[in-house]
Amino acid sequence: MNKAPQSTGPPPAPSPGLPQPAFPPGQTAPVVFSTPQATQMNTPSQPRQHFYPSRAQPPSSAASRVQSAAPARPGPAAHVYPAGSQVMMIPSQISYPASQGAYYIPGQGRSTYVVPTQQYPVQPGAPGFYPGASPTEFGTYAGAYYPAQGVQQFPTGVAPTPVLMNQPPQIAPKRERKTIRIRDPNQGGKDITEEIMSGARTASTPTPPQTGGGLEPQANGETPQVAVIVRPDDRSQGAIIADRPGLPGPEHSPSESQPSSPSPTPSPSPVLEPGSEPNLAVLSIPGDTMTTIQMSVEESTPISRETGEPYRLSPEPTPLAEPILEVEVTLSKPVPESEFSSSPLQAPTPLASHTVEIHEPNGMVPSEDLEPEVESSPELAPPPACPSESPVPIAPTAQPEELLNGAPSPPAVDLSPVSEPEEQAKEVTASMAPPTIPSATPATAPSATSPAQEEEMEEEEEEEEGEAGEAGEAESEKGGEELLPPESTPIPANLSQNLEAAAATQVAVSVPKRRRKIKELNKKEAVGDLLDAFKEANPAVPEVENQPPAGSNPGPESEGSGVPPRPEEADETWDSKEDKIHNAENIQPGEQKYEYKSDQWKPLNLEEKKRYDREFLLGFQFIFASMQKPEGLPHISDVVLDKANKTPLRPLDPTRLQGINCGPDFTPSFANLGRTTLSTRGPPRGGPGGELPRGPAGLGPRRSQQGPRKEPRKIIATVLMTEDIKLNKAEKAWKPSSKRTAADKDRGEEDADGSKTQDLFRRVRSILNKLTPQMFQQLMKQVTQLAIDTEERLKGVIDLIFEKAISEPNFSVAYANMCRCLMALKVPTTEKPTVTVNFRKLLLNRCQKEFEKDKDDDEVFEKKQKEMDEAATAEERGRLKEELEEARDIARRRSLGNIKFIGELFKLKMLTEAIMHDCVVKLLKNHDEESLECLCRLLTTIGKDLDFEKAKPRMDQYFNQMEKIIKEKKTSSRIRFMLQDVLDLRGSNWVPRRGDQGPKTIDQIHKEAEMEEHREHIKVQQLMAKGSDKRRGGPPGPPISRGLPLVDDGGWNTVPISKGSRPIDTSRLTKITKPGSIDSNNQLFAPGGRLSWGKGSSGGSGAKPSDAASEAARPATSTLNRFSALQQAVPTESTDNRRVVQRSSLSRERGEKAGDRGDRLERSERGGDRGDRLDRARTPATKRSFSKEVEERSRERPSQPEGLRKAASLTEDRDRGRDAVKREAALPPVSPLKAALSEEELEKKSKAIIEEYLHLNDMKEAVQCVQELASPSLLFIFVRHGVESTLERSAIAREHMGQLLHQLLCAGHLSTAQYYQGLYEILELAEDMEIDIPHVWLYLAELVTPILQEGGVPMGELFREITKPLRPLGKAASLLLEILGLLCKSMGPKKVGTLWREAGLSWKEFLPEGQDIGAFVAEQKVEYTLGEESEAPGQRALPSEELNRQLEKLLKEGSSNQRVFDWIEANLSEQQIVSNTLVRALMTAVCYSAIIFETPLRVDVAVLKARAKLLQKYLCDEQKELQALYALQALVVTLEQPPNLLRMFFDALYDEDVVKEDAFYSWESSKDPAEQQGKGVALKSVTAFFKWLREAEEESDHN
């Protein structure tokens, strides 16, 4: 029956599965089912032939195309159309290549589907086919746009009439509506619209969707398809299509709708006149009877979408003279149900016998209009005609529940595909894969609704309901087996056959490509609802059917809805069944598909403003279009999920949905496959059942947008756990050492030097971060132990120190001192290893480089300023301005820090005056503010050192220039004031108004906090006293008269804060009284305070009540205490109360730890003892106060206030001891007044004594204090505490403690038994202590060795006793080895070996049994203990005096250097040869021999030159050179410091390279107390030498 292509014809309804381009009017568009080209939306039409060749069966596999998972729906039977109308039939099924051409699909993916309609000749002069409109103008209403397949575009006067199916809501902005009227040609054109429409809405149609421009897919996204015959005379007529409320879809003009595959029709169908009665063709299905349905479509003017009134198919013409579209539906012989269930597609019957005539200007006929006839009963009894007054609204955007509301449904004619058996629908859909339609369009609005209202409703509905339509479509597609709601009405067998044939021949083929085109359209035009669907992925509201409006008559669908599903449906998933139930419910004509809340807009309220809540709109979240990525959008990874297109069949990983508000998962347990159950939160997502939307072919939940989020998140593609995820790997990833491979370790070895360097820098950085005045000495020791042995490391260390110094100017003094200590550091250069570079040179170069950096900074600032001026926007300009200001601020801070650091280096004599003058001149020349600020900082730092007598003229010039700058007032006031401050500073002889604000020690901080707290306490007490007076009121008078509690029983008013509790600077007290007039025991401050001179600032704060009682019991006539009368008047309670305050305040003042509390108590007890003896007869003249001495020491040690107080306490104890001696002389010995001290008390006293001794190193005082403890049986506590407290202190502290114990042993105050007992308690724990103190054995040896050195205890006895607790532990040898090592350093190994042998010691006593003694001795190098090495006859340890005499004799005799060498080797032991004694004796002898004893004394340089070799041999290192200089200093002192003598020696020694400059600098800065005699004069005499030395070094550095 294929007809030749016609020259004219209406645009055919686009087949959903076929890409079809739009063609210009008048061009034919033969359909070629081949792989379409991906073209643009507005691709120009391509002339194609209207001939439909035989099409192959559509592939059932879903792999090559996106197809609905719903079963196939039978297509409508072909209809008989009038003779003369050309019909293009599709005799065979069409093959579906898996093409991915460009698609134009409604925006929400619910594109309209139109069966390949038969084309009819176009009458010339017919009305235009929506000129100017194009598919791209309308996003959702128009049918799918398939540019890859040619479609004929007819002249503007012809309107195509594709069948309208339930179309998903779209987002295109424009649309025109047309009223479709269906007439039965067999009944004389009777209007059977209402009959058909009322009977066709029971459920989604199983016919394959036919999407034309105006086809409406049903709510599940699919549109039933029927063969359509477009009559030429109806092309000018439009169809007004109503939107379903709640499913927003954009308006579309008919031009939007994509023509289906064109089928030229032989003759035009008769056009119904506006006033004519509708002509409905009764469906006669027996045999091949053909029924023609003429659909009269009334076209209304474009109306705003605000009205959602359904369009009615009124028999009378609308005022707009809408064209009537006739649809002829011809059904051939029915197809048995078995065919639907048995085979996906039966062989199509000739299309000639299965045609539907739809008269619609845009070539689209709503599917709802066709469904009734398609599903008519087998008898094909003509349905009762609906009253012409009740128009049947048709929703082009798949809003069926509103279309037929109120339209009576003919029970006899149930043309809805839902009535078909679901088996058939399943199988047909399996082959055709059309999207199932959740519901047909029930009538929703009364006939009185106007088109304008309808369009108003549509515009809002389509934007929101489009999502719901898509959700329904997606649901139907996802459910692999879901096809029809269980309540669908079964189709008679004969009708089923016809439906299947028609579907197979005409529409089934279009489904797959329709899916792809929906995706394409979503890619291109999804801007409104589509993007909303991607942006907000919320669970869809379950689409629950609404009760029909009052005026609606439920059609036969209600009957069909009650039909249970067939038994075969037991295999379907719950998801599919839920969708079917949902679809069937929503298709009922008298019901609304969506449930509208009471306060929500309803389709019936046409004039009301449309409002939809969030849940309602979220119901459209999972529609098909929402699951596709629109084409043409920018790549926005945060918004668009790319993989939704590429892998639509991938099952959703439920673990990705844990955070989604999703409903309960109703998937049966056997289908979960071990997946985690989703949490039951939020509204259900998929449908009424709340199950997850199913993916195509039922492969599990479709991956969709996630639930509502409080904050936007990235949409991350679901990744299966089985996928191999490639992680980004860094090329040089860090690995812990334990994880590194051999290759990594090899590379690490290659870079070992670099890693060591970096480790060095890290350690230096750590030390610098901890550098404080208090920690300086400890940290400097760590620095000197670092391996700074290359130029690179030295430069790196210098850079670290320098950067730290200039960034922290307040600590520049500490950093400068560190540099001073490192000044002598030398390392070989990288280029010339033989040439060395020293620390000082590199540091000065670094300072100079930073000082001269101003020019570079200026260039950078100019560049930034230029960039800022050229900035285009104000924002960019502001940003650049901030950067410029920040850069200038940083440069300024660096300059100031550098200047301060340079000044501190100069003060330490590391820079010469010449350099500093150069800096001052350079800064003074530049009158910019930065330079002047640096100048002020520099002069403030070093002005006092530069402003000496010789340099005053130069300094005057500087300050005159500064005064000029101030007077000119060309600089800012800030700089002028800074300059003025420097002038004032010089005027005040460089004495600043405020002290140095540098860093403070912890003790200073504690003391300041203590003073502040004390002041606050005073204020509080004063306020309390005032407040109590005010509260009591009454006349002013004595406090006792007002009952003030601060008055004691004796009538004395106790001051709230006694003076005794205030911190007192005892150093100021000597200014008040003469040193000799103060009795250190009698001066008491405040009753009970008992602050004495001897007690320091802590004075007796810890006195006990018993002490106070004893004081109160003293006779008032005591002349030794001028305050004794006052003392007696104070009751014990008052003193006790005040004493508490005093104790707390004093403890804060002293800054001691909690452990020192006992120290205070112990001192107070001593104070009590003293108080007890105050009343005894003593002669003040015989007593001498030690306070003056203590104060002098305090001046020498300002940083040791604690030591000062302890020294004062020791002094008082010593005075007490003297008193006791005198008493013993006059009286017989008396036992102490109080009982012996307890262990706890003794420990507290011992702690105080030891602390005081270690601070002052006053041996006599300490011995006397221990003697006064009068507890010889408990002195082991003193020993134990002494060893324990010094174990982790410095070596000097341990040495001093050992000497104190030795002295106590020698004096008899400490027995050896007590000494050993005290040591045992420590030695027993030594092995455990070794974990925390690795060098514990060395430290113990340092404490024990002094006893042996002085001969206090024999070596044998001592070694055997102290090793008793260590032998079981096997540690005895460890301690002895350390002791022997220290003894060898002091007396030589031979003397130590002699002592060892004399004591009869053997290593066998101290080593574990079985250990090889010989191997041990050899390993530890203690062979001298075995006596194997005999001392040479001539070698002996000469005393220093004898050595000096012998060397002087040799040199006086003029002995050669070699002879002196020989004598030394022959007569001195090896130990003495390398000792400092030989160096000092040799230096003294050589220098003395070089002096020319004339007036004035001079140096014979020739002698020194001759003896240079002799000195150089033994002055082998810097330490020996320093000892030589000490010897020279002592020699000059003995000669009474002859002028210039030392300078001449220094010059000669330096010139002969006997003493190197580093040793000179070390001597200059040495603070060794043993070498201070005459040091000041000597240093002054060689000032010129050191000045010259530094200048010469500077010159060499510059050269």
From Swiss-Prot:
Result when mutating I182A? Loss of PABPC1 binding
Phosphothreonine PTM sites in chain numbering: T207, T223, T647, T1211
Question: Which Gene Ontology cellular component terms are annotated?
Answer: cytoplasm; cytoplasmic stress granule; cytosol; eukaryotic translation initiation factor 4F complex; membrane; nucleus; ribosome
- Biased composition of type Basic and acidic residues is found at 519-535, 574-583, 741-757, 1146-1178, 1186-1225
Q: Where in the cell is it found?
A: Cytoplasm; Nucleus; Cytoplasm, Stress granule
Annotated SMART domains:
eIF5C (SM00515), MA3 (SM00544), MIF4G (SM00543)
Instruction: Tell me where in this chain the MIF4G domain is found.
Output: 565-792
Swapping F776A leads to an effect described as: Abolishes binding to EIF4A
Q: Where is this region: EIF4E-binding?
A: 607-618
Segments forming domain W2: 1433-1599
Q: So what does mutating I902A actually do? A: Abolishes binding to EIF4A
Q: Note down the stretches annotated as region EIF4A-binding.
A: 1450-1599
PTM summary from the entry reads: Phosphorylated at multiple sites in vivo. Phosphorylation at Ser-1185 by PRKCA induces binding to MKNK1.
Give residue spans, biased composition: Pro residues: 8-24, 261-271
- Composition bias type Polar residues, residue spans: 34-48, 289-304, 1116-1134
Enumerate the Pfam families for this protein. MA3, MIF4G, W2
- In residue numbers, the region (PABPC1-binding) covers 172-200
Q: Which family does it belong to?
A: Belongs to the eukaryotic initiation factor 4G family.
Protein name in UniProt: Eukaryotic translation initiation factor 4 gamma 1
- Organism this protein belongs to: Homo sapiens (Human)
Q: Which gene encodes it?
A: EIF4G1
